Design a protein with these regions (language model features):
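N-terminal acidic, proline/glycine-rich, low-complexity intrinsically disordered segments
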Residues: 1-12
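Non-heme iron-sulfur electron-transfer modules
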Residues: 52-68, 100-149, 179-192, 207-227, ...
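C-terminal segment of N-terminal export signals and the immediately downstream linker at the start
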Residues: 19-25, 45-89, 279-281, 287, ...
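Twin-arginine (Tat) signal peptide motif
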Residues: 23-32, 87, 93, 199, ...
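Ferredoxin-like iron-sulfur electron-transfer modules
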Residues: 67-89, 120, 137-241, 245
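Long, compositionally biased charged/polar accessory segments in the mid-to-C-terminal portions
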Residues: 236-238, 242-296
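Hydrophobic alpha-helical membrane-insertion signals
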Residues: 90-92, 96-100
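N-terminal secretory signal peptides and thylakoid transit peptides that target proteins
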Residues: 13-39
Length: 296
């Protein structure tokens, strides 16, 4: 196979070599002037082109541009704190989550929701969540009694995936579609998920649903499991979850548990917190302020 010979006399850089056995030295400018023909089957052709682009006009390697550090999940330990002393039950968090993550409007399908938990003197916690709290709760004074028992406490309690350190959902998935990342967030691989629903049954917090036919996830897949991901596409680019961003009273706090100055670390130092269903040993990464107990 013959190769084209570049005449040094036509080389605009005058880069001919004195070695009679070697061809002319080709500079970046010469190559770009002649045009580079890409050969798809040639291994490393992309690397070669990148290398040429890094050359200076005289053929010398220039100083490369600094490369931005990529997100390292192993460097983070994301956590979440809900301050029920602050929550006003407005439902903006639910709306923001649905819009950000393409969650169906039907309250049966939700990544986060808000409950009103009314505790009575007999120790019973009564829970209601009309439309998942998406449109807030009816204004007016709190009830003084429920079922003949005096009301001792009323509070709004946002709910979401607990991002458990010992998640029961991952172990039951028959195809490994639900998994835990190095930074502690539970995700669903939509390419693997077969929509069997085992993870929904295994989750003790009711934090999952199957995307119904006719609706889509951000990637456009119906019939797969979906759940809160702390808005993983946002937090891995330095932004806060949509629900945290929109909360008007700062009831939702998010941050890195490895950082003692993060909002969650500060909140957990300054106020007593509980995790839901602690007796199950799931070790949730979501903690609650202002709650002495929880609904059964």
């Amino acid at each position: 196979m013959s190769h084209p010979v570049i005449d040094p006399a036509t080389d605009p850089d005058g880069s001919a070599t004195n070695d009679p056995l070697a061809g002319p030295r080709i500079s970046r400018r010469t190559v770009l002037g002649l045009g580079v023909v890409a050969v798809p089957c040639l291994a490393g052709s992309t690397i070669l082109f990148d290398r040429l682009m890094a050359l200076g006009d005289d053929g010398a390697t220039g100083t490369p541009e600094p490369i931005e550090a990529r997100y390292d999940p192993a460097a983070h330990r994301w956590g979440f704190v809900v301050d029920t002393n602050r929550c006003i039950g407005c439902g903006l968090c639910v709306v923001a989550c649905k819009e950000e993550n393409h969650v169906p409007d039907d309250p049966e399908y939700t990544r986060t929701w808000v409950e009103r938990q009314t505790t009575t003197a007999d120790g019973v916690v009564h829970v209601d969540s009309p439309e998942g709290g998406m449109y807030g709760f009816e204004p007016g004074p709190a009830p003084v009694a429920v079922g003949g028992s005096a009301v001792t406490d009323v509070r709004f309690v946002p709910r979401l995936c607990m991002q458990c350190e010992e998640p029961p959902c991952t172990g039951v998935c028959p195809v490994g579609a639900t998994y835990r990342t190095a930074d502690g967030v539970i995700l669903v691989d939509e390419d693997r998920c077969i929509g069997c629903g085992y993870c929904l049954v295994a989750c003790p917090y009711g934090a999952r649903y199957i995307v119904p036919a006719g609706d889509v996830t951000p990637r456009g897949v119906a019939g797969v499991a979906d759940k809160c991901t702390f808005c993983y596409h946002r937090i891995t680019t330095g932004r806060r979850p949509a629900c945290v961003e929109v909360c008007p009273v700062g009831a939702r706090l998010y941050g890195d548990l490895n950082d003692p100055a993060s909002p969650v670390s500060v909140a957990m130092r300054e106020a007593p917190t509980i995790v839901l269903k602690a007796d199950l040993g799931t070790k949730p990464r979501v903690a609650y302020i202002g709650m002495e107990g929880e609904a059964g």
